[in-house]
């Protein structure tokens, strides 16, 4: 498909009656290929119809241009046909006459017989042969919309534009018309752009779904590729492995936009007290056993002890929620996968650098690679068994879940696969899934396995859904798991608060490491407020240090919360994670990697906090030892990258970092 429509960096500004301005759209860039069906989705007021009107030529952008086949769109015309929700039929004309009026006006060069044939063809196309002589007042809403579709297609437009065409129809009629439109677009390779509020409609009809953020200044928050093959049938679409992940992706985006709107309206003023710049903090977490230090700091009073007496823990269902909260400035800090501060700083989020610092490693270990019971029943007990299965699969796709590109789950899973000569980008399909969804997807058969933190490996085993083929003790013992992350500008604006936060969480980590507190912490985590799960699935660690065995219904977590060199941020470890993210194309490897590590790893903040608590600080650099015996050379990371056998075509580039400045006083 060739480029057909180009929306080039457009803004749309409306003048207000009081002399002010309203910025509806800001910096919209979109390319549409010939024959592609693109849906625009977002909340009311996000500018969907405004964008559609500019593509139609019904309105002009304030800045930027829109082109059709390389020609600038300046006005409406029959090459760009719009179907509105309200049909726009002439009430005194019949079905046939409404369509014929458009055909006669546009196709004056065709003979009367040719025009008549075109009208009849499109009446039959939408199934209205029995109603050709009826006027709009005699038709149902669905029939009227079919007339509008037939009229639009009959004049052979280059581009079909639909503004919520089925929004006013009942569910049955809407479903039938969606099927008809889908069939027509597939048959005639129609290029279409549709505005919709209906998530299922967008997934069913689209090749791509463009998600718009809230206004004012709405922009494209994400574009989803719909990888469901055509021709499509509704019941086959809902059974496709991608259907529910696409649907949940859109719903997550829409819910997140609602939340952002509320947070914008809230604008909590920072409360300074106890010598701290801010005591009312919003800290994000994902419900995992690894969130124990945050829960303990809140419930056992460590936050309050260090002056942070108005802390709110914000529960997110996925790491993407944490990313959005940090990127948007709606969270003061968060529990993060160990690689996320580096990923954000190096431009992993929408290819823009968001400097994030980490002054505390809160957990180590706690991960495992789980495969389905179906694979176990097929005799897949080792990585080599799995590799042989893939070699014999004859093109069958095997999907493995992970939680985020920057997570140790993704990096360790990829490392484990590659070390066993399995290409994680070619031989399997890696899919980002929220942790709490892993077991359900494993049971449903939409994935073959995953790498995730507890309690989801233990739960899969206890419920007979899967088994752990490897734990982190067998891949990289004592690797960093979760860290505390805050934006760099926030840390600069709140230096005393930052130290107090690290002190509170470091004390909480020590509390979690005491075996005498395990049952108390398990009970706290199991409550509805936090993990909301059966306490039997929650274990902080196994004092005997056992790893899982195949067929053993009880598998153990190996979290380490506190100990010598366990909590200090390590530049060497962050460098290893940086090389792995570059290896798999999630970030370019930064030429200025030393600068990035210095900006990310705030050893000084950790040292201050630890010493004020009376803890010793060990600065000795530890070697990184993974199961395959490969040595990580922290002095020459590019040489290390070049020595990897399986990798993507990684790039090396300077990552531009702005000079650090304090965050605004509003959270």
Curated annotation (Swiss-Prot):
The Gene Ontology biological process annotation of the record reads:
monoatomic ion transport
Region feature CmpA-like, mapped onto this chain: 281-667
Arranged from A to Z, the UniProt key words for this protein are:
ATP-binding, Cell inner membrane, Cell membrane, Ion transport, Membrane, Nucleotide-binding, Translocase, Transport
Main enzyme class:
translocase
Q: Which InterPro entries match?
A: AAA+_ATPase (IPR003593), ABC_SmlMolc_Importer (IPR050093), ABC_transporter-like_ATP-bd (IPR003439), ABC_transporter-like_CS (IPR017871), NO3_transporter_ATP-bd-like (IPR005890), NrtA/CpmA_ABC-bd_dom (IPR044527), P-loop_NTPase (IPR027417)
**How does the UniProt record describe the way this protein sits in the membrane?**
Peripheral membrane protein
Provide any one GO MF term from the record: ATP hydrolysis activity
Protein residues bound to ATP: 42-49
GO CC list = plasma membrane
Name the predominant localization. membrane
Residues in ABC transporter domain copies = 5-239
Q: What role is this protein assigned?
A: Part of the ABC transporter complex CmpABCD involved in bicarbonate transport. Responsible for energy coupling to the transport system.
What quaternary arrangement does the UniProt entry report? The complex is composed of two ATP-binding proteins (CmpC and CmpD), a transmembrane protein (CmpB) and a solute-binding protein (CmpA).
Give the UniProt family note: Belongs to the ABC transporter superfamily. Nitrate/nitrite/cyanate uptake transporter (NitT) (TC 3.A.1.16) family.
Per its record, how is this protein called by name?
Bicarbonate transport ATP-binding protein CmpC
């Amino acid at each position: 498909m060739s480029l057909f429509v180009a929306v080039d960096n457009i803004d749309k500004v409306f003048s207000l009656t009081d002399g002010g301005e309203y910025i509806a759209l800001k910096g919209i860039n979109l390319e549409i290929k010939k024959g592609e069906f693109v849906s625009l989705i977002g909340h009311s007021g996000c500018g969907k119809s405004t964008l559609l009107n500019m593509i139609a030529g019904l309105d002009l952008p304030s800045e930027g241009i829109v082109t059709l086949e390389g020609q600038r769109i300046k006005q409406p015309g029959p090459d760009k046909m719009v179907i509105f929700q309200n049909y726009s039929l002439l009430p005194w004309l019949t079905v046939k006459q409404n369509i014929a009026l458009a055909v006669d006006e546009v196709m004056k060069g065709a003979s009367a017989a040719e025009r008549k044939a075109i009208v009849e063809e499109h009446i039959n196309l939408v199934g209205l042969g029995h109603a050709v002589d009826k006027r709009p007042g005699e038709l149902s809403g669905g029939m009227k919309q079919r007339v509008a579709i037939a009229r639009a297609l009959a004049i052979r437009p280059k581009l079909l534009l639909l503004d919520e065409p089925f929004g006013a129809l009942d569910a049955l009629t809407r479903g039938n018309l969606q099927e008809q439109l889908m069939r027509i677009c597939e048959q005639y390779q129609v290029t279409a752009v549709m505005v919709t509020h209906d998530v299922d409609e967008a997934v069913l009809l689209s090749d791509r779904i463009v998600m718009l953020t809230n206004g004012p200044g709405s922009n494209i928050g994400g574009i989803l590729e719909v990888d469901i093959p055509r021709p499509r049938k509704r019941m086959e679409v809902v059974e496709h492995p991608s259907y529910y992940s696409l649907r949940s992706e859109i719903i997550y985006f829409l819910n997140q936009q609602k939340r952002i709107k509320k947070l914008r309206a809230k604008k909590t003023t920072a409360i300074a007290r106890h010598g701290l710049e801010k005591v009312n903090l919003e800290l994000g977490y994902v419900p995992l056993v690894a969130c124990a230090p945050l829960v303990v700091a809140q419930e056992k009073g460590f936050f309050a002890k260090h002056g942070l007496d108005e802390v709110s823990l914000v529960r997110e269902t996925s790491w993407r929620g944490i990313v959005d909260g940090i990127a948007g400035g709606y969270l003061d800090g968060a529990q993060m996968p160990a690689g996320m501060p580096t990923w954000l700083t190096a431009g992993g989020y929408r290819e823009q650098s968001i400097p994030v610092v980490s002054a505390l490693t809160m957990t180590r270990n706690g991960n495992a690679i789980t495969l389905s019971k179906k694979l176990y029943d097929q005799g897949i007990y080792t990585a080599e068994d799995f590799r042989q299965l893939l070699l014999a699969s004859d093109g069958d796709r095997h999907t493995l879940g992970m939680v985020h590109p920057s997570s140790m789950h993704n990096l360790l899973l990829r490392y484990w696969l590659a070390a066993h000569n399995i290409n994680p980008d070619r031989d399997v399909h890696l899919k980002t899934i929220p942790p709490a969804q892993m077991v359900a997807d494993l049971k449903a058969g939409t994935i073959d396995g995953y790498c995730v933190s507890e309690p989801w490996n233990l739960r899969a085993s206890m419920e007979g859904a899967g088994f752990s083929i490897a734990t982190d003790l067998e891949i990289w013992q004592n690797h960093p798991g979760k860290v505390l992350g805050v934006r760099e500008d926030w840390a600069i604006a709140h230096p005393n608060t930052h130290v107090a936060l690290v002190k509170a969480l470091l004390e909480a980590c020590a509390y979690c490491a005491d075996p005498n507190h395990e049952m108390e912490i398990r009970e706290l985590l199991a409550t509805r407020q936090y993990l909301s799960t059966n306490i039997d699935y929650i274990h902080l660690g196994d004092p005997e240090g056992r790893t899982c065995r195949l067929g053993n219904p009880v598998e153990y977590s190996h979290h380490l919360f506190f100990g010598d060199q366990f909590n200090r941020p390590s530049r060497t470890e962050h460098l290893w994670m940086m090389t792995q993210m570059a290896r798999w194309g999630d970030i370019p490897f930064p030429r200025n990697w030393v600068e990035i590590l210095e900006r990310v790893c705030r050893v000084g903040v950790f040292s201050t906090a630890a010493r004020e608590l009376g803890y010793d600080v060990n600065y000795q650099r530890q070697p990184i030892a993974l199961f395959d015996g490969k040595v990580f050379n922290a002095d020459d990371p590019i040489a290390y990258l070049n020595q990897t056998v399986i990798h993507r075509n990684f790039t090396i580039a300077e990552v531009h970092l702005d000079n650090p400045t304090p965050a605004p006083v509003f959270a």
